[in-house]
């Protein structure tokens, strides 16, 4: 299974590069006897459109059919990370300055707006307008929050 994911990753990264997109995640798994291949793409400069997903899906599907590396039948989906996307790098925090986030630390969860990122410190404005400094290496999990 690792070999399949590795090969799909190569194919998906190549397809993403062609359309100026980035590969965000790949999952290949069996659920209730059916195989699923989920590819998540990102556009670092804009949003991911349905056309982006369609283009990557066609490219990947074509290459997978041509190379015949997945022996069983599977369902392919291509999507974006979503509105509540995870923030997985310091660059993600920089990219989403002024956006609302939910950050889980060891013993607390904080919701606020990213105001700045310097070195490996995130400056977060909480509801009370107080700025909290959070070291990146203390973050267990972080996601964008939908701001209504």
From Swiss-Prot:
One of its GO terms (cellular component) is cytosol. Belongs to the RimP family. It is found in: Cytoplasm. The lineage of its organism: Bacteria, Thermotogati, Thermotogota, Thermotogae, Thermotogales. Required for maturation of 30S ribosomal subunits. It comes from Thermosipho africanus (strain TCF52B). Pfam families: DUF150_C (PF17384), RimP_N (PF02576). Coiled coil: none annotated. InterPro entries: Ribosome_maturation_RimP, RimP_C, RimP_C_sf, RimP_N, RimP_N_sf. SUPFAM superfamilies: YhbC-like, C-terminal domain (SSF74942), YhbC-like, N-terminal domain (SSF75420). It comes from the Bacteria. One of its GO terms (biological process) is ribosomal small subunit assembly. This is Ribosome maturation factor RimP. Keywords: Cytoplasm, Ribosome biogenesis.
């Amino acid at each position: 299974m690792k070999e399949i994911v590795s090969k799909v990753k190569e194919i998906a990264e190549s397809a993403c590069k062609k359309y100026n997109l980035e590969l965000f995640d790949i999952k290949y798994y069996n659920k209730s006897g059916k195989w699923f291949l989920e590819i998540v793409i990102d556009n670092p400069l804009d949003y991911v459109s349905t056309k982006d997903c369609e283009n990557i899906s066609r490219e990947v599907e074509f290459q997978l059919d041509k190379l015949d590396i997945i022996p069983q039948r599977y369902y392919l989906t291509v999507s974006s990370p979503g509105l509540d996307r995870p923030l997985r790098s310091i660059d993600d925090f920089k990219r989403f300055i002024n956006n609302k986030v939910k950050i889980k630390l060891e013993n607390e969860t904080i919701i606020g707006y990213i105001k700045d990122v310097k070195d490996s410190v995130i400056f977060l404005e909480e509801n009370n307008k107080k700025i909290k400094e959070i070291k990146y290496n203390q973050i267990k999990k972080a996601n964008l929050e939908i701001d209504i």
